[in-house]
């Protein structure tokens, strides 16, 4: 019996394979003991006493959604093999000198096997900058994965890569089609738990985003899914303390790009005092002050993206706005919106004129010529990182490198102040 090629580089539990397949696979104990504690070998979580089963074994609750791992069982994997050498890059665009410098740095990182952090402002053109290094590894017969914590980011990346690369591309997330083996994979970071020493190059985009940031299980997945001699590259527009520390310790090389691809500065957020938003919302009405800002913006006819702190408030705001602005086509999206992707596309195509969103759209999506309002910008869910990302939706396109970016608040907090300061610093660093 021959090994199913789709199994190469993948990690399996006992119940996912037939008896014959298990005999062909390499084996790992499902759990390991260290300093008197038990750890799951798939997700590296510490096994708790209450996860004990009546049959006399422990199970891991942390990665249970990926099929149960039990201490009395084995994990199985099939070593990855090289792909045929090929020429995969179809993209013939031109990088700016700033992008070119980062692209060159990444090619050198592969040659020197140096883990690298790319800290590039929102709208710098990070995707194009990784093309050369992705192509280099695939052309040599290697396997590459682009991973992100956010499904929306994965879908955007997948669309872009399909246009610009000639090889097959597998897209993996919670509701995607089954995996098929291909030299280029786009996956949510959770999906990396299903791989073992599979990739020559793993690029993790949006490393500052939930659910990846401060998640030891996903850090382990990133480490485990790369070959022993493979390379990890991290992309971010807002670095984290953890990454900055690794740069200081020399564990990561940092490549900076403080300038957007079109050469114009990042838009500086404008804080606007708004103390009566919730008072009016509770009465199912719109704050007159907020209404006047929306009316003024709608006269421009540019699309308007409004960020709300919570799903319930966002839904309510969408209903009120539709009453107040009957000529506008208004949508609302959150992590639980079933037709989110369709609404996002409708907004991009101009079929929706106002879109209200939770932080789900704070990153990885581009809407040409958009203006952005954040209501309750001082809400605890709007961190410095998320406010910088939200701000990065404005002024991304060459057609309109400017735009309105308004932070409505009822008290300036540290997150708003730090976000504004960091955006100003990035512009200064870019010489703008």
From Swiss-Prot:
Zn(2+) binds at residues 40, 43, 60, 63. Oligomerizes via its C-terminus (residues 73-432). ATP binds at residues 120-127. The lineage of its organism: Bacteria, Bacillati, Bacillota, Bacilli, Lactobacillales. Monomer and dimer in solution. Interacts with DprA and ComFC; ComFA-ComFC form rings about 150 Angstroms in diameter with apparent 6-fold symmetry. This is Competence protein ComFA. Gene3D superfamilies: P-loop containing nucleotide triphosphate hydrolases (3.40.50.300). It comes from Streptococcus pneumoniae (strain ATCC BAA-255 / R6). Disruption phenotype: Over 1000-fold decrease in transformation efficiency. GO terms for molecular function: 3'-5' DNA helicase activity; ATP binding; hydrolase activity; nucleic acid binding. Keywords: ATP-binding, Competence, Cytoplasm, DNA-binding, Hydrolase, Metal-binding, Nucleotide-binding, Zinc. Involved in transformation (genetic competence for DNA uptake). DNA uptake is energy dependent, this protein may provide the driving force for DNA uptake. Does not have helicase activity, translocates on single-stranded (ss)DNA in a 5'-3' direction in an ATP-dependent manner, but does not unwind double-stranded (ds)DNA (tested with 5'- and 3'-overhang dsDNA). ATP hydrolysis causes the release of ssDNA from ComFA. A ssDNA-stimulated ATPase; dsDNA does not stimulate ATPase. ATP hydrolysis causes the release of ssDNA from ComFA. ComFC has no effect on ATPase activity. It is found in: Cytoplasm. It comes from the Bacteria. Its EC number is 3.6.4.-. Residues 107-257 form the Helicase ATP-binding domain. Disulfide bonds: none annotated. GO terms for biological process: DNA recombination; DNA replication; DNA replication initiation; double-strand break repair. A motif (DEAD box) lies at residues 205-208. Residues 289-432 form the Helicase C-terminal domain. InterPro entries: DEAD/DEAH_box_helicase_dom, Helicase_ATP-bd, Helicase_C-like, P-loop_NTPase, PriA_helicase. Its cofactor is Zn(2+).
């Amino acid at each position: 019996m021959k090994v199913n090629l789709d199994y190469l580089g993948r990690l399996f539990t006992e119940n996912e394979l037939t008896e014959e397949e298990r005999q062909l696979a390499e084996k790992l104990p499902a759990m390991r003991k260290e300093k008197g504690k038990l750890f799951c070998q798939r997700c590296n979580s510490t096994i708790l006493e209450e996860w004990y089963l009546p049959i006399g074994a422990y199970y891991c609750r942390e990665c249970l959604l990926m099929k149960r791992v039990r201490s009395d069982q084995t994990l199985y994997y099939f070593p990855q093999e090289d792909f045929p050498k090929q020429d995969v890059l179809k993209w013939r665009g031109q990088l700016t000198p700033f992008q070119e410098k980062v692209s060159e740095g990444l090619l050198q990182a592969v040659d020197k096997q140096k883990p690298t952090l790319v800290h590039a402002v929102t709208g710098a053109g990070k995707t194009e900058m990784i093309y050369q290094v992705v192509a280099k590894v695939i052309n040599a017969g290697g396997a590459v994965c682009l991973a992100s914590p956010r499904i929306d980011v994965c879908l955007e990346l997948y669309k872009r890569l399909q246009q610009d690369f000639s090889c097959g591309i597998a897209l993996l997330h919670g509701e995607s089609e089954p995996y098929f083996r291909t030299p280029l994979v786009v996956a949510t970071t959770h999906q990396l738990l299903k791989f073992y020493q599979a990739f020559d190059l793993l690029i993790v985009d949006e490393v500052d985003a939930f659910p990846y940031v401060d998640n030891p299980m996903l850090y382990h997945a990133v480490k485990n899914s790369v070959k022993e001699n493979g390379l990890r590259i991290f992309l971010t527009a807002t670095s984290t303390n953890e990454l900055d520390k690794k740069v200081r310790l020399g564990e990561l090389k940092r490549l900076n790009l403080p300038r957007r691809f079109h050469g114009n500065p990042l838009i500086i957020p404008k804080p606007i005092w708004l103390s009566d938003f919730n008072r009016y919302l509770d009465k199912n009405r719109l704050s007159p002050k907020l209404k006047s800002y929306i009316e003024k913006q709608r006269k421009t006819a540019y699309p308007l993206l409004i960020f709300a702190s919570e799903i319930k408030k966002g839904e309510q705001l969408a209903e009120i706005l539709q009453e107040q602005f009957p000529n506008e086509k208004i949508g609302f999206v959150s992590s639980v919106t079933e037709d989110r992707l369709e609404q996002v596309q409708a907004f991009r195509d101009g079929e929706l004129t106002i879109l209200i969103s939770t932080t789900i759209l704070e990153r990885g999506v581009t809407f040409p010529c958009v203006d952005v309002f954040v209501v309750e910008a001082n809400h605890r869910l709007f961190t410095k990182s998320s406010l910088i990302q939200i701000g990065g939706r404005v002024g991304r396109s060459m057609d309109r490198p400017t735009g309105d970016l308004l932070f409505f608040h009822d008290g300036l907090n540290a997150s708003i102040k730090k976000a504004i300061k960091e955006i100003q610093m990035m512009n200064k660093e870019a010489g703008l």
